[in-house]
Amino acid sequence: MRRPLLAVDGDSFAHRAYHALPKKAFRRVDGGPGNALEGFTGMLLRLWQGERPRAVLVAWDTLTAPTYRHTAFTGYQAGREFEPELLEQLDLLPDFVSSAGIVCVKAPGYEADDFLGAAATGEEAAGGNVLVATSDRDAFQLASERTTILQPVRGSAPTRIGPAEVRERYGVEPAQVPDFIALRGDPSDKIPGARGVGEKGAANLLGQYGSLEKMLEEGRFEAEAEALKLYRSLATLDRSAPIPDLPDLEPDWEKLAARASEIGLGRLARLLEDAAAAQ
């Protein structure tokens, strides 16, 4: 049986790593912060060791350029700010991870989730299975018989989310997730949602009508129709995002260990050397 493709939301895991490890305890040889570099790489290694995928793709946001979502809705992710020491490491991480031969994707106009959607769609079309590692629940729309979401849990193995788990959590099908977000809203992305509609109400409406489009056709939310269509587009992953070919490839942990040692992350280097020896 063909091993799955592992597609990782780089920004999601880097944020978790940055806030999980103390900045003062992890410094690079040049004095800069190394906690996100160390924590992210450790998370990535554990994912690889636990799942043994055929290849790994790490997707990144482009923080220096707006996406079509920001252009379409000026309130999208409004007020979101990052600490300078996190931004510095987000800038370093793609090149650092690429030292192991891991494919990293990043392009103006796209979010990491868009690349995850494109990777999942392409792998499924080729008859493969996909593991999508992210804490962003927008990605629940990707859950299928072939695509499983790996949601990180601190101090434990990731929670596996398939179609049944999406139904259990939200009462909707994965394909309904963008409509669900449009109706309920998403505080993390500053998507307002429909007035007076919460999580349960959104699920009930989708159970009754099947889709936001059907609701609007039948006259529901007439005053908010255009706004809700916009919110749905914001929540829909762009599965046409450009990704390279992804041949089977095991990470070269030894090369990444050398890179970690070079920048002064000795503990991480030893961890990666052990992983290389066990390959």
Ranges and model annotations:
Residues 2-3, 52-57, 125, 144-148, ...:
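Non-catalytic nucleic-acid-binding/docking modules located in mid-to-C-terminal regions
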Residues 2-133, 137, 141-160, 229-244:
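Noncatalytic, basic helical substrate-engagement surface that gates or grips nucleic-acid strands
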